[in-house]
Design a protein with these regions (language model features):
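Transmembrane-helix signature of polytopic, membrane-embedded enzymes
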Residues: 75, 87-88, 177, 194-217, ...
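Short acidic/glycine- and proline-prone juxtamembrane loop motifs at membrane-interface regions
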Residues: 106-107, 179, 183, 220-233, ...
């Protein structure tokens, strides 16, 4: 026998690859030492078994903020969400369509857009109108003789006016319903969409209804829906893009979780029981992002209404990129930043930006189709002046199109003529300078108010309860974004960043407060988020996130106090001890003890390690910990949290290790047995408060891997609530109520529901007080003065 044959053999067995076989006998026991095995850089990846891959996928989905595969919210909850949206839609319909024909006058900038829409409907292009006030008076009488054949110079893309022309085509051009129908219906649809977005973000019908009502009763939203101008249409298309962005986040993360879980894994160290990561350091490719493509379409159409939508393309694109980086980091991808750039960032760019450009160009098809439109001769005029063309050799229509855009750019960046109602972007969030859209003084208004002096007024001031409370809510959202890395807070901030912050570069330009209607939905979502946090009814953003609470409403009482059982001495301590076993989120209270299988008390050891699954030994009937009821990083079979803080990627990543971290690593040219794949070693937790059993202690001393294994994937739903025993034998066991899954909203408390109702009541009261000034009703002059709280509102 050669010297090589006398060495201990290494085989693939139940102790894992690269370990000495246990059948060597006593003579070779001293030589049996564990070694790391082959070079991990040459260690090929191995896929998981189907049941382990399924458990891994659901664990990843939880940490990525997604429900498990095939799991939906309860039918009752979903129905309540739709009912909440329907109620909000009804309120929005009444407030926007009631007496929509009043006032029968061209209001504010309707002189540009209503007549422009009529010209598109009548001629196919925007013609010039002869005379200003005279043309408006004739238009109100149905006399359109002021419309001439020569084209009018317009400074906005045509899509918004084509949409407004649809209302005139349906209801005629001689009444306010025809002029304003399109903007009114868009306003109602925006309310429904905000309610559905809130339901998707917060998973609470109560908060969805609150968001819908707040959106439906905001004064700026009502005024802009009852006026034939472009900004309401712009806001709706951007909101559609935001909705598609949220769907893309879910869709792309679900794909990533599935491909990681069913892909190949390897151990960086090659050691048995070591954490596992995807074999590909770049992670899997996520091909196909249809919802991001849809977001590009919606944002491109928004740009076809007004150019300010271009900032939404940039802001939402950055949000999608940041979420992709965070998702790969959570999934344990080693080169997560590079993969986020090249495998997610570039494909996302080519899904979003070209779609937006194509949709924007599609909005100009009528302009290309009709040579009578303004700007078609710009290329020829430039050649006559001896100027060069933007694209030499391109058709005149293309060069004229580019020159037309240069002309619009120059107009928007040089408009600085003074206006009585102009304001700055920082004035908008406090509603300092609203715009007077319509005013009929006492000398012209009919005397229908019952007072000596009656007036009719329409002002664009928002609901002060929404906007002023929204300013406080914005602070809460910023705290949640930076402190808790809550993706919902970052999504709301993306809306602010898209439609509000860019105006800071236009301080020298004439701009108006009603532009803020474009980010009104995000003000409402911020207020909803803050109210939900204060009322403690906002669910978790992902499986590892604690409940958000800023102490504005008292925390819920412990479940034990809701039960009709006596509270003898020691019950509170033993209950907290038991809950700490389940959640691993709080220290043992003084005097708390654990219960051994035999019933004798055992002193807790806060420094030793013990498998969390052994809680059933100390508390009979306790199920295995559910991976979605606590921080996944604290459970066996799931990755340990990284000590490196997560990057500021607008998400809530908690770790950087893929699941499952403790699978034995099969050596090359071997197959993993079912027991190898299905029984991962549980990682030792040095922070556990329980002492190891004898087998674990012996295994630790000999250097061998732990002898206990997880029985398989953990069930996400406990079979039965455990019984928690008191050290006092005279105290009967207390059954703790079953714990909710992480995605379920917390139980509603009367104080929380009352708080939400109180804020909603304030919003309704403010809307009732201001509604006459949002709709131009005939009111007394003194009643109008009662609403002018600030001198800048006059």
């Amino acid at each position: 026998m050669s010297e090589k044959d006398t060495t201990p053999s290494t085989q693939q067995g139940e102790n894992g690859p690269g370990q000495t076989h246990p059948a060597q006998g006593p003579a070779g026991a001293a030589e049996q030492k564990w070694h790391p095995g082959p070079d991990p850089r040459r260690n090929p990846g191995m896929p998981l078994e189907a049941k382990d891959a399924e458990a891994c996928e659901n664990s990843l989905r939880g940490r990525l903020g997604l429900l498990p595969v095939g799991v939906k919210l309860p039918v009752k909850t979903r129905r309540q969400g739709w009912v909440a949206a329907a109620i909000a839609a009804l309120v929005a319909f009444v407030t926007r369509f009631s007496n929509l024909n009043h006032p029968h006058a061209i209001v504010f900038d309707e002189t540009y857009y209503v007549k422009g829409a009529f010209s598109l409907l009548r001629k196919g292009y925007e013609g010039a109108w002869e005379g200003a006030e005279k043309a408006n008076e004739l238009f109100l009488k149905g006399d359109y003789s002021a419309l001439k054949d020569n084209a009018d110079r317009v400074v906005h893309p045509p899509l918004g006016k084509w949409i407004m022309a649809a209302g005139q085509w349906l209801f005629g051009s001689d009444n306010g319903v025809g002029w304003r129908f399109s903007t009114a219906i868009v306003g109602v649809l925006a309310v429904i969409l905000v309610a559905r977005i809130a339901m998707r973000m917060f998973r609470s019908p109560l908060l969805a209804g609150f968001a819908g009502i707040a959106m439906a009763l905001d004064g700026m939203g009502i005024v802009m829906s009852r006026t034939g101008i472009l900004d309401n249409i712009l806001a709706y298309f951007v909101l559609l893009g935001f909705w598609a962005l949220l769907l893309d986040r879910e869709h792309s993360r679900a794909k990533l979780a599935k491909r990681v879980a069913y892909g190949e894994f390897r151990s960086p160290s090659g050691a048995p029981g070591a954490p596992r990561v995807p074999a590909d350091p770049w992670g899997p490719r996520v091909i196909g992002r249809p919802w991001l493509f849809a977001a590009g379409i919606f944002l491109g159409l928004a740009g076809g209404v007004k150019w300010s939508a271009i900032y939404a393309v940039a802001a939402f694109g950055l949000a999608a990129f940041a979420w992709s980086l965070s998702a790969r980091r959570i999934a344990g991808v080693r080169l997560w930043f590079g993969a986020g750039v090249f495998r997610d960032g570039l494909p996302a760019f080519f899904a979003l930006v070209p779609a937006a450009v194509a949709a924007y160009l599609a909005a100009w098809i009528p302009w290309f189709a009709d040579s009578r439109s303004w700007g078609h001769d710009l290329a020829k005029e430039a050649v006559k002046r001896g100027e060069g063309l933007p694209l030499t050799g391109a058709p005149d229509a293309v060069n004229s199109f580019i020159l037309y855009h240069k002309d619009m750019w120059h107009f928007h960046h040089t408009l600085s003529s003074h206006h009585d109602y102009q304001s700055q972007m920082w004035d908008w969030i406090i509603q300092r300078r609203p715009v007077s859209f319509y005013w009929l003084g006492a000398d012209k208004a009919s005397n229908k108010c019952g007072a000596q002096s009656c007036v009719e007024a329409i002002t664009s001031i928002g609901n002060v309860a929404v906007w002023w409370l929204g300013l406080v809510a914005l602070i809460v959202v910023i705290l949640a974004a930076f402190r808790h890395k809550d993706w919902r807070a970052w999504a709301i901030l993306a809306g602010y960043g898209a439609m509000w912050l860019p105006w800071i570069s236009y301080t020298n330009r004439t701009i108006f407060q009603f532009y803020a209607v474009a980010f009104l939905p995000y003000v409402v979502l911020a207020l909803t988020f803050a109210v939900g946090v204060a009322a403690q009814i906002v669910g978790r953003a992902h499986s590892g996130q604690p409940r958000l609470s800023f102490g504005l409403v008292s925390s819920p009482a412990r479940p034990v106090w809701r039960q009709n059982v006596p509270r003898p001495k020691g019950v509170r301590s033993q209950l907290r001890n038991a809950i700490a076993v389940r959640f691993s989120d709080e220290p043992l209270p003084p005097g708390a003890v654990s219960q051994s299988p035999s019933g004798a008390p055992q002193a807790p050891d806060a420094t030793s390690a013990f498998p969390p699954s052994a809680a059933a030994q100390h508390f009979p009937g306790a199920p295995a910990p559910a991976p979605n009821t606590a921080d996944d990083s604290a459970l066996p079979g799931l990755p340990a949290p990284s000590s490196t803080p997560a990057p500021n990627t607008a998400d809530d990543s908690t770790d950087a290790t893929a699941c499952p971290p403790n699978m034995p690593v099969p050596t090359p040219n071997t197959e993993a047995t079912p027991s190898d794949a299905a029984t991962p070693h549980l990682e030792r937790d040095e922070t556990s408060r329980f002492a190891p059993d004898a087998g674990e202690a012996n295994a630790t001393e000999t250097g061998a891997p732990p002898s206990w294994h997880a029985p398989g994937p953990y069930s996400p739903m406990p079979a039965a609530p455990p019984e928690f025993h008191s050290p006092n034998p005279n105290v009967p066991p207390i059954a703790a109520p079953p714990q909710k899954q992480w995605w379920e909203p917390p139980a509603k408390r009367m104080t929380g529901v009352f708080f939400v109702g109180l804020v909603a009541a304030v919003i309704v009261a403010a809307a009732a007080f201001w509604y006459p000034l949002w709709t131009g009703q005939n009111i007394s002059h003194s009643f109008w003065q009662l609403h002018m709280w600030l001198p800048s509102w006059i």
